[in-house]
């Protein structure tokens, strides 16, 4: 009789940057379904690297890790403020499922950029996706997304990704392979997953007015209506750049703003607002120009 071989275990976790919670929603949905798909898949705690402190820690993985890795799209690319952190990741042969979430305009080169970063950091990307979420600037553009239909798509995507991952650890007859053979198969055969996007990467998307003039909103920051602020401190906690600080009895925006709008959308009193004319013009142009529902794009 041949020796009994146990299936190679996989440790599944989500890892995400999510200013308003939309990327988190998709990443966790995918990770949950992958973890339930096979008996040898096990759910591990997620890593939320939205808080600045979380991006100061080292993250090291190995060949038995499956990381569903999600970031939002900013200006058609991976947010440039995340690049130094992403360059510290150590995949060490881990499997990754890169996911980007965009606000109904276009994900441009964000997905291929994220895939390339993960590959360069030692991950094997075997499946990838671009999902849609409510635009950070707006409550109209892709309002309420990801919605129930998106979560259903995420579940189907996760099942397909799980089947692909598990195929690396079984032989042609569907029998579990010895651990060393399974690891070798992952290292030699897994990824990179083909995705949409251009190489070399295109420049960051720049908003324009209808005459083609560039609208610069890089230094735009939200303002605080002190008559509405109750000093609850939620904004201090949710700002991913650590740029909202106490200025008792209120708060002040004192640092880089990436316009994730977590402060504006999560403030229970609606105390944050934007009044920059260029920003408001660009927001309206997005709402008028991209009203049609877009659907997720999946790559397995």
Language model features with spans:
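FMN-binding flavodoxin-like domain, especially the glycine-rich phosphate-binding loop
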Residues: 3-14, 18-26, 30-47, 57-219, ...
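Iron-sulfur cluster-binding cysteine motifs and their immediate structural context
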Residues: 224-226, 230-258, 262-280
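Conserved SAM/SAH-binding loop
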Residues: 51-54
């Amino acid at each position: 009789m041949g020796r009994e071989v146990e299936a190679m275990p996989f440790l599944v976790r989500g890892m995400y940057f999510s200013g308003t919670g939309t990327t988190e929603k998709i990443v966790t949905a995918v990770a949950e379904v992958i973890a339930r798909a096979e008996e040898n898949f096990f759910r591990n705690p997620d890593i939320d690297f939205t808080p600045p402190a979380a991006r100061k820690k080292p993250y090291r993985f190995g060949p038995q890790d499956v990381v569903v890795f999600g970031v939002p799209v900013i200006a058609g690319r991976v947010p440039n403020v995340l690049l130094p952190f992403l360059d510290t990741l150590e995949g060490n042969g881990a499997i990754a499922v890169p996911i980007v979430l965009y606000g109904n305009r276009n994900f441009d080169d964000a997905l291929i950029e994220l895939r390339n970063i993960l590959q360069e950091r030692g991950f094997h990307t075997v499946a990838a996706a671009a999902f849609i979420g409510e635009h950070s600037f707006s409550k109209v553009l892709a309002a309420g997304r990801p919605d129930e239909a998106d979560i259903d798509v995420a579940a189907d995507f996760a099942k397909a990704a799980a089947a692909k991952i598990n195929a690396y650890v079984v032989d042609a007859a569907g029998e579990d392979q010895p651990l060393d053979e399974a690891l070798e198969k992952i290292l030699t055969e897994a990824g990179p997953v083909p995705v949409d996007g251009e190489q070399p990467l295109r420049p960051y998307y720049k908003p324009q007015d209808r005459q083609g003039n560039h609208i610069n909103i890089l230094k735009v920051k939200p303002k605080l209506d002190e008559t509405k602020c109750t000093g609850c401190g939620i904004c201090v906690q949710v700002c991913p750049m650590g740029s909202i600080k106490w200025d008792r009895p209120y708060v002040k925006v004192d640092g880089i703003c990436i316009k994730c709008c977590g402060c504006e959308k999560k403030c229970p009193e609606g105390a944050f607002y934007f009044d920059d004319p260029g920003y408001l013009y660009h927001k309206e142009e997005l709402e008028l120009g991209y009203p049609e529902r877009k659907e997720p794009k999946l790559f397995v």
